UniProtKB/Swiss-Prot annotation:
Protein source organism: Arabidopsis thaliana (Mouse-ear cress)
Function: Subunit of the chromatin-remodeling complex (DDR complex) that mediates RNA polymerases IV and V (Pol IV and Pol V) recruitment to chromatin. Cooperates with Pol IV and Pol V to regulates RNA- and RNAi- (RNA interference) directed non-CpG de novo DNA methylation on cytosine of genes targeted for silencing and enhancers, also known as siRNA-directed DNA methylation (RdDM), thus leading to epigenetic modification of the genome and promoting/maintaining heterochromatin.
Motif (Nuclear localization signal 2): 305-312
Protein name (record): Protein CHROMATIN REMODELING 35
Subunit structure: Part of the chromatin-remodeling complex (DDR complex) that contains at least DRD1, DMS3 and RDM1. The DDR complex recruits/activates the RNA polymerases V and acts during siRNA-directed DNA methylation (RdDM). Interacts with SUVH2.
UniProt KW Iron-sulfur keyword: no
Cross-referenced Pfam families: Helicase_C, SNF2-rel_dom
Source organism, top-level taxon: Eukaryota
UniProt-listed InterPro entries: CLSY/DRD1, Helicase_ATP-bd, Helicase_C-like, P-loop_NTPase, SNF2-like_sf, SNF2/RAD54-like_C, SNF2_N
Phenotype reported upon loss of the gene: Reduced association of NRPE1 with chromatin, leading to altered chromatin binding of the DDR complex. Defective in RNA-directed non-CpG DNA methylation resulting in reactivation of silenced genes and enhancers, whereas methylation of centromeric and rDNA repeats is unaffected. Reduced accumulation of 24-nt siRNAs and reduced DNA methylation of siRNA-directed DNA methylation (RdDM) target loci. Increase in CpG DNA methylation leading to abnormal maintenance of some silenced genes.
Recorded family membership: Belongs to the helicase family.
Keywords linked to the UniProt accession: ATP-binding, DNA-binding, Helicase, Hydrolase, Nucleotide-binding, Nucleus, Plant defense, RNA-mediated gene silencing
Motif (DEAH box) on chain: 492-495
GO biological process: cellular response to exogenous dsRNA; defense response to fungus; DNA methylation-dependent constitutive heterochromatin formation; gene silencing by siRNA-directed DNA methylation; heterochromatin organization; positive regulation of chromatin binding
Amino acid sequence: MGFVYIVMTGYYKNVHKRKQNQVDDGPEAKRVKSSAKVIDYSNPFAVSNMLEALDSGKFGSVSKELEEIADMRMDLVKRSIWLYPSLAYTVFEAEKTMDNQQVVEGVINLDDDDDDDTDVEKKALCVVPSSSEIVLLDSDDEDNERQRPMYQFQSTLVQHQKNQGDVTPLIPQCSFEEVDLGRGKEMPSAIKAIVEGQTSRGKVLPIENGVVNEKGVYVGVEEDDSDNESEAADEDLGNIWNEMALSIECSKDVARETSHKEKADVVEDCEHSFILKDDMGYVCRVCGVIEKSILEIIDVQFTKAKRNTRTYASETRTKRFGESDNELKFSEEGLMIGGLAAHPTHAAEMKPHQIEGFQFLCSNLVADDPGGCIMAHAPGSGKTFMIISFMQSFLAKYPQAKPLVVLPKGILPTWKKEFVRWQVEDIPLLDFYSAKAENRAQQLSILKQWMEKKSILFLGYQQFSTIVCDDTTDSLSCQEILLKVPSILILDEGHTPRNEDTNLLQSLAQVQTPRKVVLSGTLYQNHVKEVFNILNLVRPKFLKLDTSKSAVKRILAYTPCDVRGRLTGSNSDMASMFNETVEHTLQKSEDFTVKIKVIQDLREMTKKVLHYYKGDFLDELPGLADFTVVLNLSPKQLNEVKKLRREKRKFKVSAVGSAIYLHPKLKVFSDKSDDVSDTTMDEMVEKLDLNEGVKAKFFLNLINLCDSAGEKLLVFSQYLIPLKFLERLAALAKGWKLGKEVFVLTGNTSSEQREWSMETFNSSPDAKIFFGSIKACGEGISLVGASRILILDVPLNPSVTRQAIGRAFRPGQKKMVHAYRLIAGSSPEEEDHNTCFKKEVISKMWFEWNEYCGYQNFEVETIDVDEAGDTFLESPALREDIRVLYKR
């Protein structure tokens, strides 16, 4: 016996053809003919008759899917009663009659328990005869007699076959097709009341403002003999997509020609949600309306200047060099008002923090009152890519702009490589190094090229400071260009000019453009005043601005006057008093409530100028175990430490101590120049007792473990003598050679050798150790081939160590990273470590503290070596001299 599933297919709009093509010559052939299988809703008794037909069928056991259909039926009944209240008596009388009906023969009972017969009857599903029945909901518009019905109930017949007395249901093979028919027609109120809220497998069909979006889902059973129908359906679907493409093109023309007044009169039937698609532009994800074509986006932002447009250089020929008319020209062209957007190619690659950073740059640099800002994003977070994207958008919209990028000389190749990777148009990148412009005349020639065409100029910090501070006549022209022409100044590693007493900070402050951007992965270095020196660079007299005055007064009020007097003295100015007060409160105050108030005020006064990103993307990496390993010194080392404490010069203590803590024999080299020959070092290494130097012994045990585990090691130090010593120790102990297993990077390494060493170390399976001067391996260095890091000494600036660890713990790292900060116990180095940690606390509290941290004091965690979770520390040889182990 056949069963028929009654499913409401949506707003069916003539997509599937009928099984039999009935073609008549007369006009009446196109009208829907009434039959026993058609229910005409223009008949007032149609609903009543349909419900009676539904309720008079046979009943079967209810599965989960059939329950849904039964629920759909009940929903239709309720809405029909709401539309025709007179049906209520008929329906409820039918329900009473259903309780007294007996189960018809031939119905499969899927429930084994006789006790559940009552439930089965309650969940009975209406079954209509085995022939397919179609219900057409006709329009109430009687004038349009030839209009086909918009809504259709189509039944699906599922055959059951008997095999050896058992009844086995044949599982229907259903196909699902989604047809978007665009905007629907206005519905008569009666039909709208019936259809509104109907469900297709529990999903409500949307009706907005009385207009039906004719977007339906056809659910049917594929028939073996329906090849012709499938081909016809495919042809119809193809026509639909063609019609949609035509509609989109038509909508573009209408959008351009419609006036603003006419647009205001149009009643929107869609709450648009626009998204950016690379091939179309800003498109509504709901209805497909294009707000802005991709061609318009590119034309506005990335068109080249017209030939009849004067260049920046030609316009200044009639004026004295350096006049401020350059800024006036920007204002006339709308630079202060016009918005800026990232190129679609860049936007598709941006992460959320980069998108937020791009918008932050626009709010400061492209505004009515432009000013500088600080982008303090974590190392490896993509600051370079973000600012490259901004500069290309900036230049595309304002081709006359002159960007100047000042950065450490060593990372210039990295910047150029990134520019080539992300360029959307060919913008010349100029610098003095590649052009070998060594004298002022050659440098002036490069600067004139930069002025005359759309390009970007790169200079090193030292080079910029030297030119600006040069008093010779040859430098005057170069100085005038560098100080007056730049329209935007980018400072990578922007914490470099943090000392107010240096020529570098003073020379950068003389650049006249208000658009200055500082990029830094470690903004806080040593002291609070250094951060405010950088703030004063991008926003002159920052503490005296109206946005800062109230916060400054509140912060000063938190500290008693006698404490402020002891900190700064009676003759100190307000800025010095403020900086010392903040540093003392965050570092030494025992009242955590006061610390929180200071943090909140600091963030309030800098929120529009400073954009901070901690680096949550690092959580996606395999992980970081940052250990501080305090070692017990050998007797000979302790004797040398006693002598070292008599030294009053702090730098001397640090330099000599770094050698002694590694091995006492290195003391003889600490006073000499860094140029120690391999032969001299080899002779000393062959004679020494390794047990006398705990750090040297730790290093040798560590490289043995790394070699066995197939992991690569990074070794960082502030000084070259320790690096040279360990390089020769590894060569003699393991037979490793420089350039194959061992690589070295210092401040004297050329750019070409620098790039080659990084690429070879990361890619070569033979590479074992990379020795690096910790200051030379700053931003722009990626050494993700290594998974173990050894820090030999304690830089007084804690951010230097953080950057060194960031060389390996950054995007691209595939392994868990373990860092070991070696500390000589009972020595001045242990005291330096405590001082550095207090500086770290200030940075963490200022930028990273939140209400979820509670009243924690940011102390490092002391852990047992056995519970460190590091297999290397389980080695007896490696853990032999460990006195205490900390973990950040």
